[in-house]
């Protein structure tokens, strides 16, 4: 029996080979071909892909098959739709953008300075804020926004997050609120911490974990709620998450002001204490919702003006006095409070390099300072009814009295 079974099985295999030999051969070749493709030189495969891409894109207008004259030239994304610059739910028109200004940037080794400057200015046109967004939320008050942002500053200091992270969160919060209606105050903390959660993941190398963000809310927000709100915010903002923040503009201005002979702008070269002094003025100003009336670049330039001079401001920002005059006057009571109370000393954080310490967001009694600034604003308004210039406005020093070496800072 075993012998007969073996003979019968052998005959069946021979029959199958005769009937389906071609199919088996094709399958075998197919397997070998797949293995060959898998094991071939990846450089050869990438070269084929590059040649195919060049052949397919040869007729595109931006490909002239010529050597690029400027290797630092930036190529715009083709067929990219213009950003929507209007908030659909906003009842107020967005603020007027300041006219384009000349580039103060030096010659850059890594890009064309005019193109970089153009991109920076375009961000101010596409990332809009609405100072009147609270009109869409009858149950909210300006004080609630100030309390929330002050708390976010405190969270940033606890977790040693950067100033850029805080200002990204502030921008996300304000722009998100401009797209919504009738938000209740019980949701503000969730929106704020979710905005900071997004900002930290974008900016920080080692952002805090989700449970750490939930922990600082003292049980008011769960991790799942933060994740849900995170997605809602990003969808409402149409995934536009890379604005040029107030502190980013300040960093650019300070870099240009303290350029060395090599004109390098890759690493900070300005005094940290002066940066902190100006940054704390901006920290106070951003708590007032009226700051959204001005573009971020003007806010940073106005803060720099209050601690330097008109000539330096114009040199590093490209603005003229008429461009920032209203913002400078609006900022006067805030600058007076900062000057009276004094700026904080540079704090050193464990695990943070000394050269990066000024970039860590710090917290002080900002709400008390805000109340003092508003009181001074009311006092100045009373005093200035008969005066064209508000008292306390810093008058630019005369050119003959300026120091000959280095930028002049207060």
From Swiss-Prot:
Assembly and binders: Interacts with CDK2 protein kinase to form a serine/threonine kinase holoenzyme complex. The cyclin subunit imparts substrate specificity to the complex. Found in a complex with CDK2, CABLES1 and CCNA1. Part of a complex consisting of UHRF2, CDK2 and CCNE1. Interacts directly with UHRF2; the interaction ubiquitinates CCNE1 and appears to occur independently of CCNE1 phosphorylation. Interacts with INCA1.
Pfam (any one): Cyclin_C
Modified sites of kind Phosphoserine: 103, 387, 399
Segments for region (Disordered): 1-30, 378-410
Protein name as catalogued: G1/S-specific cyclin-E1
PTM info: Phosphorylation of both Thr-395 by GSK3 and Ser-399 by CDK2 creates a high affinity degron recognized by FBXW7, and accelerates degradation via the ubiquitin proteasome pathway. Phosphorylation at Thr-77 creates a low affinity degron also recognized by FBXW7.
Compartments reported by the entry: Nucleus
Source organism of the structure: Homo sapiens (Human)
Organismal lineage: Eukaryota, Metazoa, Chordata, Craniata, Vertebrata
PANTHER family hit by this protein: CYCLINS (PTHR10177)
Phosphothreonine carried by residues: 77, 395
Tissue expression: Highly expressed in testis and placenta. Low levels in bronchial epithelial cells.
């Amino acid at each position: 029996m075993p012998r007969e079974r073996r003979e019968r099985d052998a005959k069946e295999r021979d029959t199958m080979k005769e009937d389906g030999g071609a199919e088996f051969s094709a399958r075998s070749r197919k397997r070998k071909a797949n293995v060959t493709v898998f094991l071939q030189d990846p450089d050869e495969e990438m070269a084929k892909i590059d040649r195919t891409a060049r052949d397919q894109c040869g007729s595109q207008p931006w490909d002239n098959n010529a050597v690029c004259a400027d290797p630092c030239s930036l190529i715009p994304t083709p067929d990219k739709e213009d950003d929507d610059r209007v908030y659909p739910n906003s009842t107020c028109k967005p603020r007027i953008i300041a006219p384009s200004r000349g580039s103060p940037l030096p010659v850059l080794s890594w890009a064309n300075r005019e193109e970089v400057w153009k991109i920076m200015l375009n961000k101010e046109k596409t990332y809009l804020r609405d100072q009147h967004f609270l009109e869409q939320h009858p149950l909210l008050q300006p004080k609630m926004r100030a309390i929330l942002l002050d708390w976010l500053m405190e969270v940033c200091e606890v977790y040693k997050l950067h100033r850029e992270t805080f200002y990204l969160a502030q921008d996300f919060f304000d722009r998100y609120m401009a797209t919504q209606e009738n938000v209740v105050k019980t949701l503000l903390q969730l929106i704020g911490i979710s905005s900071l959660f997004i900002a930290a993941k974008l900016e920080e190398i080692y952002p805090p974990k989700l449970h750490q963000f939930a922990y600082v809310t003292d049980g008011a927000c769960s991790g799942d709620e933060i994740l849900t709100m995170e997605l809602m915010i990003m969808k409402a903002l149409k995934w536009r998450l890379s604005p040029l923040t107030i502190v980013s503009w300040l960093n650019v201005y300070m870099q240009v002001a303290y350029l060395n002979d090599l004109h390098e702008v890759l690493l900070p070269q300005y005094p940290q204490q002066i940066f902190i002094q100006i940054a704390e003025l901006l920290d106070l100003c951003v708590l007032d919702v009226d700051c959204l009336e001005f573009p971020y670049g003007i806010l940073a330039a106005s803060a720099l003006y209050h601690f330097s001079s008109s000539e330096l401001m114009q040199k590093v920002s490209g603005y003229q006095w008429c461009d920032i005059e209203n913002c400078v006057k609006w900022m006067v009571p805030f600058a007076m409070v900062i000057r009276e109370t004094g700026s904080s000393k540079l704090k050193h954080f464990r695990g943070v390099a000394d050269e990066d310490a000024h970039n860590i967001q710090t917290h002080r009694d900002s709400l008390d300072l805000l109340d003092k600034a508003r009181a001074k604003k009311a006092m100045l308004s009373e005093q200035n009814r008969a005066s064209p210039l508000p008292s306390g406005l810093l008058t630019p020093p005369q050119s003959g009295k300026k120091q000959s070496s280095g930028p002049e800072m207060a």
